[in-house]
Amino acid sequence: MSSMKWLSATAVFAAVLPSVSGFCFPESKELNFSRTGTSSSTTFTETIGENGTEYIVSGNSSFTNFTNIPVKKPTTDDSSTSTPTTSSAVDPTEKIVRASSSSSPNSGDTSATPDPKGGGAFYNEHSGILSFMARSGVEGSLTLSNIKMTGDGGAIYSQGELLFTDLTGLTIQGNLSQLSGGGIFGGSTISFSGINQATFSSNTAEVVPEETTPNPNPGTQTTTSQPSPTSKVQSLFTYSSSTQANGNGADSQTPSHKPGSGGAIYATGDLTISDSQEIVFSVNKASKDGGAIFAEKNVSFENITTLKVQNNGAEEKGGGIYASGDLSIQSSKQSLFNSNTSKQGGGALYIEGNVDFKDLEEIRIKYNKSGTFETKKVTLSLPEAQTNKSSVTAASQSGPNTTPTPTPPVTAKGGGLYTEKNLSISNITGIIEITNNKATDVGGGAYVKGTLTCKDSHRLQFQKNSSEKKGGGLYTEDTITLSNLTGKTLFQENTAKEEGGGLYIQGDDKTLTMTGLDSFCLIDNTSATHGGGAYVTKEISQTYTSDVEEFPGITPVHGETIISGNKATGGSGGGVCTKHLVLSNLQTISISENFASENGGGACTCPDNFPAPTASTPSTNQTAAPKDDKDFLIDYVVSTTIDKNKATKKGAGVYAKKAKLSRIDELNISDNAAQETGGGFCCTESLELDTIASLSVTKNLAGKEGGGLHAKTLNISNLKSGLSFSNNTANSSSTGVATTATTSQSPTVSSFLPRATAGSSPAPAQTTPTYAGVVGGAIYGETVSFSKCSGLCQFTENSAIDNTPSSPSLNVQGGAIYAKTSLSIEAEDPSTSYVFSKNSVSTGKAQTTGQIAGGAIYSPSVTLNCQTVFSGNSASMATTNPPSGTSPKDTIGGAIAGTTISLSKTSHFSENTADLGAAIGTLSGGSSSNLTEKITLSNGSFTFEKNKANKRGVIYAPSVSIKGNNITFNQNTSTHDGSAIYFTKDATIESLGSVLFTGNNVTAEQASSTATGGQTTNTTNYGAAIFGDPGTQTTDTTLKLIASSGNITFSNNSQNTATNNPATKFCSISGYVKLTLQAAQGKTISFFDSIRTSTKKTGQAQNSYETLDINKTENSNTYAGTVLFSSELHEVKSYVPQNVVLHNGTLVLKKNAELHVVSFEQKEGSKLIMEPGAVLSNQNIANGALAINGLTIDLSSLGAPQTGEVFSPPELRIVATTSNSGGGGGVGGYVTASKNLSAASPTVAATNPTMADNKVFLTGALTLIDPDGNFYQNPILGTDLTDVPLIKLPTTANQVDVSNLTLSGDLSPKKGYTGTWTLNPDPQTGKVVANWKFDMYRRWEYIPRDNHFYANSILGSQNSMIVVKQGLINNMLHNARFDDAAYNNFWVSGVGTFLSQQGTPLSEEFSYYSRGTSVAIDAKPRPDFILGAAFSKMVGRTKAIKKVHNYSHKGSEYSYQASVYGGKFLYFLLNKQHGWALPFLLQGVVSYGHIKHDTTTLYPSIHEKNKGDWEDLGWLVDLRVSMDVKEPSKRSSKRVALYGELEYSSIRQKSFTEIDYDPRRFDDCAYRNLSIPMGCYFEGAIMSYDILMYNKLSLAYMPSIYRNNPVCKYWVLSSNETSKVVCGVPTRTSARAEYSTQLYLGPFWTLYGNYTIDVGMYTLAQMTSCGARMIF
């Protein structure tokens, strides 16, 4: 390196300033004078070594105001030659040096332009290192300013490595190069380190185009040019710098790098800036690339406190930095790229390699622009040259052989950042902010051709960026991966003229993958086509994974997704547009307030209809998604909200193909609006909502179908806390454009949706799709199912409205749910309830010719296997009159409409409204001759209450099947008959519990119908709850009532126009109906209202009419129940034009009830019961017989007897047949009045009745019954009676046939007026009569009573006193406690006894038990004497059952006792001389008792009872003497003793009188007993842990030496009959065993207890007591 020659920086200035020309090549010399072009006073050291040159700066060193750019003066008009003017003052505005100047001058042409020369301050043309540093320990600053050169590096040029180290300040300002590197040009690496502050400002790299001077006389004029001083200097530089033989100096040939690039720095090698405080690049310009920095390799910033790259500009690429290699910013605090501009890409950064942001506090890329904008232009600061018009004209002219070069299309990608490869961001602790950048091409904020990876960082934000094409915030051509980001990852207020307002990913196989983000936000972004927030073709996914479970077994969730306020003004996907959106394991998801002018206001993910990007050809080889793959998936999220989104077409919230939302705690879909379908969701195939704790779908709106949810297949399952669909609306006109409703309750689509702007791209022309109508206010689907949901599931105030101003024709169906094919709701949890409330379908302005149906639900197939409530739902039509010639259809199904409808479990319908089927109605599914519509209610309880049908039927269908536990139709109303059920083919009602039709009302008196020929006829409304109408069919409808496990009842069903007045017409069933009645054994079908049926059959023959079978055996099921007609509530006259056959069971005609039939036949084994005034009659439409085989007359009600009658007898009536009768029955048939009865001649009995005859056939037993005993209380029976009428019969002889008639039943009453009946079998008066023989009057029915119970209760009283005595002997006395030192004691005991006595010849079986409490206190006046007193209370119960006579006794007892007890230890002296004595113990108890008894005796067979109250007084005396056989010793506590006892008890029962049934008076009686128990006992103590337990066991034989047999006399008050009852006393001998124990817990407390059992031959008594003793 010794041959190297170095040109010092001062050489440049020495050539210009002769005063310093002697110091051109200093070596290791301290220089202390000015080295600037103007003036400076600083210390500056230059050291030249073999490896390079080193400058040590002390203090402030500056090099300013120098240029080598020659200035050409313009020539005058009259001069033919031009002479340059030499000036020492350089004009920095001149631009006369061409970029294409020759590198070596032509010796023959003295006017040639000198070669470009740079490095005005420092110039190094060799490969050695050029370094600048501060003196150790001394601050040093370097300033290079206003140096403008024709060559590379305006201030510094170095072919070798360039180093800046440890400078306090470095200022490169206002410098210019007409090639590259306005401030610095480095031919190798450039490094800055340890700089406190470095400023690169207002530097420029500009390539000046070649200028041509015009020659006015080219043929004759010559130009003489003399070199200027500047030219001499350039020649000197060339010479001094070209001493090498090969001539490879930097200025000897055309440069290989990019001229016009690197406004501040141009580096052919790596550029590294590290370990510095503040680095600023500002207002630098480049006419090509890299407004501030251009690097042919890598650019690296490391450990920078503040980095600012701002207000720089490039005419082409990289307004701030252009790097052909990679860009790395690491370990720094603040990095700012602000207000930089470029015209062809990378407004701030244009990187051909990778970009790496790592370990930073914050990095901001703001207000940068890429492209040409009218608002601001790049201005270059260059030396100016005066140019005349002729020169411009000459420069613009080209030779004849010149071919214009076509201008390539200019792209301007990446308003803030452009990278040809990958962008990596990691460990940013503050913020990554890319805001307010613009690009006229793609990527307003950033353009990344490779992958973008951001991890372990805080706040990645793209805001207010804009693109004239795609990707307003971010545009990438490869996958984006975001992981472990904290704060908000934000894309906000970005705009794009094409797709992807927030971000855009190019390519069908690229994804946006996010893991572990705190918050991902797409907010207020806008695109002019698709994807307002984001456009990602393949997939967008966000999830959270964690290896740590805070709670075992529970996967943690974290993070949120917010997609809000985004707009796609000319396409789909206002929030996001992607083929797959997957969000899982998150805390919160919010998709809100987004807008799309086509589909998917919040998200568009439908792969089949996925919108292709602008100017792109859809791929023809895309891989089809798997059939089970979900293109929209939200899983395992705490809270999800999809609200306030809007779409001009479909799916305001989400537009997808297959969507699934699962395992969500709270899901809210609300306030979304779409002009066509799916306000909340629109899925072309399926939508699944699974395992959601709380689901709310509210206030969504669609113009046609599915205000809330729209899907081909919709499955909702496993909801844990129910769901809520409320205030969702489908509201539109027939053209598909929403109109404004006339009321505030009917919102329209247009009021919610913004209009597309004028600049929006027009939507492609499409054909109007075919819609089912305005359907599905909350839900639309082809197949809809709900399963395994729990809690309360609500559908409230959803609606479908057609607001067409006039002549609408759309169907309006399914206010809450519309299922095109089927709807299924299943619930396994019995507490689950589905509530449909105030849902509606309607026309808002005009009546429609379409079908309005299903206020809450519409589907051809409806299956509800759950508990449901339908309340306040309606299907209604506008009240305006329709245009002439139109025929609006009746509205159907206020709650449910469909073809086949099946309900099970429990359903409640209330206050629903429609024309037909106020609650449930069916729509035609076939021809009128083959009706397939059917309503089935089964296996549950069903209630229909206060529903209103504007025409007919709470239930309306051709076929109805009801089979349930409890079925109620209550207070429903209709205009015409059929207020509860209207059917046209068949109906079956089977009760498994109770079926009740009550209080239903018909408001109109007449029903108008159109007959054949167009004539209108009126028929009478009877107020029928059930109405059958076959229409034009020739056969009657069929109605079958089956009371299988419960009763069926019709009551108070009426026709009443004025509801304020009481009704006068009541009817249960009407219409053209063939009726069948079946009641199981013990069950009843009750008609408290009339039946008024008609028939399509005609003719006068009985066999021309249908048969009404009552209790006919069917399918091996035998029916033997009751069918009842009753006029208890109001008049009941039933007309049934059928032949009635009573097969089994019972037919009851209550008092004054009438049944008119064609004929009546009673089969053997059945029973016909008629009460007084009842009428069974045939009708006048045909001849028909009444064949009665055993008639029962219920005499409970007397009816209205006439003179000579004991009661009003029932009537068997025959009426004459009219010649013109036929088919009328109850609807129009005339019924003759009852004929007057007159004498009739005897008739011959007919054994086989002919049912076609107009005759009464009466045979078998005539049974009189009086179940309540009322009839025989009639005083008229107090005398003998003859010819008492029992039955009214026809008076015409040939109309009566009586044979083998017998009288039976309650003929001999047991109480009341008793007597006997005899039958007069000859009905000679048109009646069946009988004679009555009076016997006597009895008030009560007699039943024998043996009455032992009252006497036996004495034994219970005795036992209650013995149990107290046993407690005192065995506990309180306890061998008189002579070994006990305690003197005063308080005792509390619980006592109980049980006495059982078997039945004996003298007594009945009975039992007695009692329980109570005893307290006692005693003292020991002397050690050998004890005295105490006790008080006891017992509560007992006595029970006895006499099975033979069917009566039972139940008695209660209250016993109160007072006792005195004592004990004395004595010695009986046997031998005084020897001192022999026999010790013995004397114990005694005296008790007095007062016992109260309260007893009830029940007589179930006669439904009677007695009550008796009495008192007992008792005494008990007991004396026990015991003598030790073995006494305790010091070694043993055992004692063996013999004892004898004297026990006397006396119980006296006081007199008393019974009340209620046949009372008796009982006299006093007493029971006395003296017994002498004799036996032995054994005692012993056990000691453990200072606790003493003393036990005693005694056994005794107990003979009774005296007793009496209690005898009680009584009188029967009603008859003065006297008798006596003897008490069944126990046997004389019995045995007794006793066990007692005492547990000494310490000196003051003792626990004790005893158990006694007495066993006799017929008796067993058990007695026990236990308690505690306190010593004081």
UniProtKB/Swiss-Prot annotation:
The keyword Protein biosynthesis does not apply. Its main location: secreted. InterPro entries: Autotransporte_beta (IPR005546), Autotransporte_beta_dom_sf (IPR036709), PbH1 (IPR006626), Polymorphic_membr_middle (IPR011427), POMP_repeat (IPR003368), WDR48 (IPR051246). One of its GO terms (cellular component) is cell outer membrane. Residues 235-256, 384-399 have a biased composition (Polar residues). It comes from the Bacteria. It is a peripheral membrane protein. It is found in: Secreted, Cell wall; Cell outer membrane. The keyword Heme does not apply. GO terms for molecular function: ubiquitin binding. Gene3D superfamilies: Autotransporter beta-domain. Pfam families: Autotransporter, Chlam_PMP, ChlamPMP_M. Residues 1-14 form the signal peptide. PROSITE patterns: AUTOTRANSPORTER. Disulfide bonds: none annotated. GO terms for biological process: double-strand break repair via homologous recombination. Residues 77-88, 100-111, 203-234, 734-744 have a biased composition (Low complexity). Belongs to the PMP outer membrane protein family. This is Probable outer membrane protein PmpB.
